[in-house]
Amino acid sequence: MNKILNKINWLVAIILVFAISSCKKFIKEELVTTLTEDYYKTDAGLEDLVKSAYVPLKWRFEGEQSYCMTNFGTDEFREGDQFNNVRYNDYDANLNSNDAFVNGLWTNNYAGIRRCNQGIELIAAFNDASSRLLGTQAQKDLRIAELKALRGFYYFQMVQQFGGVPLVTTVPSQPQYEFPRATVAEVYIQIISDLKAAGPALPWRYTSADRGRATRAMAYHFLAKAYLTRGSAVTDQRGQKPTDMDSVIYYANDVIANSGHALEADYGALFSAGYPDGVIPPLGENGAAPLSNKAKIDANNASNEIIFAAQFSSNLNLASAANNQTHLFYPTQYDAGMPGMTRDFFNGRPFRRLRPTDYTIDIFDKINDSRFFKTFQTVFYRNVTSNSGLAVFTAANAPNPSLVGKPRVGIGDTAAIFIVNPANMPILTSTIANMRYYAVYARNKQTAVGQPVTTDFSANKYLTMWKFSDPIRLTTTNNEARGIRNGTYARLADTYLVIAEAHGRKGDYTTALNYVNTLRNRSAYKTNEARSPQIWQYMGGPNTLANTSANNLATLTLFTTNAPSELYPPTVASTEARFIHFMLNERTRELCGEFYRWEDLVRTETLLDRTKLYNADVSPSFAAFHKLRPIPLLQMIAQTVNGQPMSPTDMAAYQNPGY
């Protein structure tokens, strides 16, 4: 399927309507190409049309919109020192209806919706019993179900970012110029209808060439999330119903129990392409700089935990113009100011756009929960081949005389370390000075006991999130930006958290914790599993390789009391409210950075409180209206009201409040 998707990248932007505001008929769009409308009356043409409906899925991962619209402006991340698009993190006046990402989200999703509408109508009308592809009703039903699942998904993305949007579910037979916004409740009715209708005709999952297509697991996962989002509303009006949480539980359980998808045994198996291969050399000796290999990325992409992902190709001839670029935005500046380090493929191209907040670092149990060290890179291994200018062992600090004059760090050994010690365990600067590493960044340090605690963490020296690290990429050019990881939209761990939250919202905290603890059992250190020495050197943890499952389990007291480990906002006073914040914390621990956070905070009506509390970069202009994005100006100037261009008054009425 990926091959076909990439072949038609050039095609769909011309043939199919890219934005809902276009008034051209389908036949007029066709005339600018060598194809005719008749091509889409053939089974091959209809197959290509279906596949074209997947192309807009890639947009999220192809540039800086990825983090801007999901991770910036939340409690999890703040700005690095080379920040772009700061308006999404600070919520300043530059976030407005002229914004390129707002327009891109709108046009890409409506491009997908348009293709879905066309495919649904044309396939329903197709009648050729001799067709190998669409000759039976079951074959037609399968493709129509795919398109309905995608349409529901695209509308779900839209309603979470914009609120009410125009609902278009047919291909207009005449030019259309007016697109009134439906209410949020009406959009959710459409989303739920599409995803419900799609599920029964789809297979639970694909395991080979068709991986990446919509499946029943995909439809029901997002159906559960749609019910959860609608039913989470307290002050917002989303058309919520008393049965929404029951529906969440029903569909999420169906995915968990019947889809054939399974959690990875090791949390790190989802992201292992970013982890180093190789052996640290003996002191004074050179080894090899860390490497990865394409097989690890292929394994990450093929994980059975992944329910739905945008597909990216590693074939230069088939790849999109941008491919997956999310690996660019999280690395710290390791290639300057870190002796022994230079830019390489393994550590990535450090755009330094965003760094984790203190909340994000503190919310993990670093001693018992492996997710922290499998999410954040704390060690950089020397990759500079020349010893010139690098510190050597002296007679005063060499562990044995044979090492005098040799580099303190050989190639492949630890050149720099980020120590994530807690504030109540600061490291003395004299201790840091005696470490053999070329660079040490302590989160908490002091010159002497009782003196002020300071930090080495900064806007360009911070913890790198390596979930999206891509040490292979499309070419071997050192600054190659086009990655080859797929872009994950849904994995089974999220389904577990969705069903857990639904049970908790119904007051069944015991069942909620059962699902949470399934993930915590997975992420606990196993007996003899390697772990960071920081645990016992700087955090007060035990110097053992014991199983930590028992210590990693969540208990009721984490939200029935004001547990210090959960960092609850001071305004949160009830068990019910603490449970919601506990689930947000659990989503950070499991899903940090995976492009959910802004929508999670909006869904739970906590965006304003949590972002103000934990993100030091937000501006004073950050306000409640920022829970929605502005409607693109391009949409408004391209349509009419009662046959006339939109007036300023019409635009103000059409626009979201505050913009």
Could you describe each region identified by the protein language model?
Residues 157-160, 164-166, 229-238, 507:
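Short coil/turn linking the two alpha-helices of tandem helical-hairpin repeats
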Residues 2-4, 23-78, 89-92, 96, ...:
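Acidic, glycine-rich segments characteristic of secretory precursors and extracytoplasmic regions
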Residues 24-84, 229-434:
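An aromatic- and glycine-enriched ligand-binding surface/loop that stacks and positions planar moieties
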Residues 99, 103, 370-374, 378-524:
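C-terminal substrate/ligand-recognition segments
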Residues 20-26, 54, 95-96, 109-112, ...:
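Long, intrinsically disordered, low-complexity segments
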Residues 43, 47-60, 81-162, 176-189, ...:
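Conserved, well-structured interaction surfaces
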